[in-house]
């Protein structure tokens, strides 16, 4: 286990792969069909294989923001924390910036719409804590450190190790306040109804993230929330 780290004694690459691996058998074929049909209503045409690749990508890469230098500097090379109060606060912003600017969907006519959905999904994967409306367009959040969105160093290591897992070769970079401002400003001007479909991608992220984390940190115990998500995705929910 080496940097980048997802948590104490947990590598980020292991967490990325683990979050998707634990979904095996937990998402029904009907759920993928629901995503495909819902997208098609808004002119976003993706066959089932395309939908599955997109779900895999967003689950595997949902914690890209944790590759920020600020977070990684809290750990040694073996993911042992260098201080007791380490934190990944605001890491969802780095993940969102990566998907908004540098994620490249598989061949689809409305690629920008797809990127918007995945961006919202990763930005809201901590939606019990923060939602997009909590962020101000013209300033970083309180106690934000720009090193939190410097992703090139460790994010590139992550992407290199995930080649063959995600759908295509991708790049990541260090992001800036201008990137943050422009992304949030663009979303503040959007009112398209299709944007609500981000929830269809959010559910697999949250299930994979919570399941893998519980296996690593809590000896496999499941919360009631995780059980609800399992039921929704395996039952072909219409979230």
From Swiss-Prot:
| Binding, Mg(2+) | 63, 92
**What's the effect of swapping residue 63 to A?**
Significant loss of endonuclease activity. Complete loss of activity
Q: What is its EC number?
A: 3.1.-.-
What PROSITE patterns does its record include?
Answer: HD_CAS3
Is the keyword Metal-binding assigned to this protein? yes
Report how activity changes across the pH range: Optimum pH is 3 and 7-8. Expressed as a fusion protein to increase stability.
- Required cofactor(s): Mg(2+)
- Which keywords fit this entry according to its UniProt record? Antiviral defense, Endonuclease, Hydrolase, Magnesium, Metal-binding, Nuclease
**Official protein name in the record:** CRISPR-associated endonuclease Cas3-HD
The lineage, from the top, is:
Archaea, Thermoproteota, Thermoprotei, Sulfolobales, Sulfolobaceae
This protein's encoding gene: cas3
């Amino acid at each position: 286990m080496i940097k980048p780290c997802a948590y104490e004694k947990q590598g980020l690459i292991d967490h990325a792969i683990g979050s998707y691996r634990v979904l095996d058998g937990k998402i029904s074929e009907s759920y993928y069909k629901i995503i495909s049909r819902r997208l098609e209503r808004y002119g976003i045409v993706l066959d089932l294989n395309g939908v599955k690749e997109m779900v895999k990508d967003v689950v595997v890469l949902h914690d890209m923001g944790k590759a920020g230098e600020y977070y990684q500097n809290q750990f040694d090379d073996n993911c042992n924390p260098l201080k007791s109060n380490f934190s990944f606060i605001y890491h969802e912003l780095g993940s969102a910036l990566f998907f908004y600017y540098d994620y490249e969907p598989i061949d689809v006519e409305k690629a920008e719409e797809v990127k918007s959905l995945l961006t919202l999904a990763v930005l809201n994967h901590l939606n019990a804590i923060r939602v997009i409306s909590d962020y101000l367009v013209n300033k970083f959040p309180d106690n934000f450190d720009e090193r939190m969105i410097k992703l090139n160093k460790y994010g590139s290591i992550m992407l290199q190790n995930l080649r063959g897992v995600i759908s295509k070769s991708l790049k990541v970079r260090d992001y800036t306040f201008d990137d943050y401002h422009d992304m949030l400003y663009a979303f503040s001007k959007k009112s398209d109804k299709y944007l609500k479909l981000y929830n269809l991608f959010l559910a697999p992220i949250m299930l994979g993230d919570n399941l893998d984390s519980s296996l690593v940190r809590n000896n496999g115990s499941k919360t009631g929330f995780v059980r609800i998500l399992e039921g929704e995705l395996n039952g072909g929910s219409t979230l």
